[in-house]
Regions:
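Short acidic, glycine/serine/threonine-rich loops at helix termini
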Residues: 19-21, 71-76, 132, 178-180, ...
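Active-site-proximal alpha-helical scaffold in enzymes
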Residues: 35-62, 101, 215-236
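Flexible, glycine-rich active-site loops centered on histidine and acidic residues
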Residues: 58-92
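Conserved beta-ketoacyl condensing-enzyme motif
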Residues: 1-38, 163-178
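Short beta-strand segments
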Residues: 9-11, 60-66, 101, 240-245
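Condensing-enzyme catalytic core mediating Claisen C-C bond formation in acyl metabolism
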Residues: 78-151, 156-159, 189, 193-210, ...
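Internal helical hairpin/lid segments
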Residues: 167-192, 196-228
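Phosphate/pyrophosphate-binding loops at sites that engage ATP/ADP/AMP, CoA/4′-phosphopantetheine
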Residues: 1-6, 149-163, 231-232
């Protein structure tokens, strides 16, 4: 399998993405390091899909990870320091998730595995800065970026919330999720009946004291690989808007009192049958190989 991977898109929360560098070094695959903070899974997925769509690769690996203790040491305080965390703070997830993207044409020849879903669209996010400076309230810093990307996505794709079974953000958690709903309502967009946040799903918050919820690159990656994709494969959800969110801070900018810009990248993931029905209607004249240029298997 590693020989068939043309590119690896990988990133994490540590400086110079060293977790990714050491973690995938033995794969001996061409690697493109990426950093989008906690939005990195959305960044790797969207970039990987565009590479495959453009014909630059038949198979790419998209992977990210995060680790609680290392993130605390780099961005806040070492765990053994015993710093008290406010209720707005999020708990960095120790976890990793990876997916392989392949073109339809490549799948018809290799038959590596049964594909779970298809990526049918991406919306690359813009940096949005509302002047938030509290590193213990990253949900508030990321919510405006999530709002901006979701609104832009609806405009670009001429869609509305009801076109998706779920709209899933990365790690806004309790505070950021409420802010997102309010910000979208100001724009006359209501996603409250179908919104889900990975940071609120990853932990059992009634049993685990994680304050506002989960965060980190691994948060959305783990939920995507272990929960979202199986739900789509079972046709429980047929169309999902996956929007990982990231707070673009560093320990230097934080210590200097700079604000925390946010970013979010949206990826449309669809069940195979629901996509194929619409795809066939619009592309009857195209062959399967040509059709592979406009859709990506996961």
């Amino acid at each position: 399998m590693p020989k068939q991977i043309r590119y690896v898109f990988a990133g994490d929360l540590l400086g110079q993405c060293i977790a990714s560098s050491f973690g995938i070094s033995e794969l001996n695959c061409p690697t493109i390091g990426m950093y989008g903070a906690c939005s990195t899974m959305g960044l790797t997925l969207s970039t990987g899909a565009m590479f495959v769509n453009a014909g630059y690769a038949d198979h790419v690996l998209c992977v990210t990870s995060s680790h609680y203790a290392s993130a605390e040491r780099q961005f806040r305080f070492p765990s053994d320091y015993g710093n008290q965390r406010p209720l707005s703070a999020e708990w960095t997830v120790t976890g990793s998730g990876a997916v392989v993207l392949e073109s339809v044409q490549a799948h018809t020849t290799t038959q590596l595995d049964i594909p779970l879903a298809k990526i049918t669209g991406v919306t690359t996010g813009k940096i949005v800065d509302y002047g938030i400076t509290d590193s213990m309230n990253m949900g508030a810093a990321m919510a405006p970026a999530a709002c901006d990307t979701i609104v832009q996505h609806f405009e670009d794709f001429k869609t509305k919330p009801s076109d998706y079974d779920k709209i899933i953000t990365g790690d806004l958690s309790q505070i950021g999720s409420k802010l997102l709903i309010d910000l979208l309502c100001e724009k006359k967009i209501d996603i409250s009946d179908r919104h889900m946040d990975c940071g609120l799903e990853i932990f059992e918050r009634k049993e685990q004291d994680v304050h506002a919820g989960g965060s980190g690159c691994g948060c959305s990656a783990v939920i995507l690989a272990a929960y979202i994709l199986p739900q789509i494969q079972k046709k429980i959800w047929k169309r999902v808007l996956f929007v990982p969110t990231g707070a673009l801070l560093s320990k230097i900018s934080f210590n200097e009192g700079a604000s925390i810009p946010g970013i979010a990248h949206a990826v449309v993931i669809e069940a195979l049958d629901s996509f194929d029905e619409r795809f066939e209607k619009k592309q009857k004249a195209m062959s399967l190989a040509e059709g592979g240029k406009s859709c990506r298997n996961i």
